[in-house]
Amino acid sequence: MNMKNNADLEKLRLHLANRLTELAKENLNLLITLNSNNYIDIDNVIFDYDSNDYKEFSKTLADVLKYIDFSNISFAGFKAAGVNFTGYHNVTINPQTIAYKDLSNSVLKGVKFASRTYAEDIFKDVLLVNTNFTGSVGAQIIPETVKNLAGGKMASVTFFSKNNGEMFKGCDLSYMDFTGSYGAIVNPQVIYKKSLINTNLTDALLVRNTSFDDCYVTGTTFSGQDISLNPQTLRNKTIEHCHFNGVEFIGDDEMFKDIRILDNDFTGSKNAIIDVNAIVGNYIEGNNFADTTILNLLNGKRSSLPSQTKHLKLEGASIVVQNQEEQEAIQNLYGLSSNTKFVSQKDNDEAYLNRVVDELLESYLTRKLTK
């Protein structure tokens, strides 16, 4: 047989796949090291090559790749885009040498990235759209040299930058999840289109005194970020699917005026005032209003109000009412327990005035304490 002949090579692959399958039945932890010899290159067995001499895993071996130790296998020229490496052993990749510098849509669990110094920047110009780094080892990324990180799951990644305030300058962070990453510092004013659409900021830091002016915030998870947000300064007038834990809202009773708010979770936020009459269409379905203050819950012009009660969560909110009759009507309409917090209009106004005065005095008190 001639191992340079494609037909004979395919027969060899079939025999190898069958042998590994049988061995795996005897040893559930099977891990085999394959070696080249003087008449066959192991790369030609494991990989198929295209006309550009780029390579991909042989489909014939797809079910047994998990039994192969890749320690001595080079992935230079490998078409890694879209590949799920989960379950493969000892794969080491240098992103600068893979085909087209493309790791988009790949799942990199277990992959080790070739160790490099900061100056060498092994992810420079590499495509990382929808890339899942969870469970990988050694991924060190300088974001401004990558730009498009949209859709990425960045667990296990360490981020670096020479200028932390502009670490993600020009980068697309939409649909990106920072959970489990290290070192990320985000300035919404310098990212691509100022957009945090469906961005999960868990384990990232936002720059001090973060401004969200003209930013697009929807589907965003803040997860304990210590930041202030005025909804009126956002570019988008529909805010949905956000998790506002840690966010302090600033503004008066009309902070959500002319804004649609749908399916958000306000748990862990501060000072959010929900005036139902000010919201577009008075439509509040799907929101978890824990830790908010709600005005005009009963008086809003809501033709579809009864249909909203099913997915609306009011436990943990402070509901402002004019009198006992209004409180009872709200309890009956929404099926609320007697433990729901209701606040009189007078007490709510007093609390609001106290908070505003505290804010006005804050700078004075701070200066006095530092003298």
Please tell me what each predicted stretch does:
Residues 9-17, 21-354, 358:
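Tandem repeat scaffolds
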Residues 1-4, 365-371:
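Non-Sec secretion/translocation targeting segments of pathogen effectors
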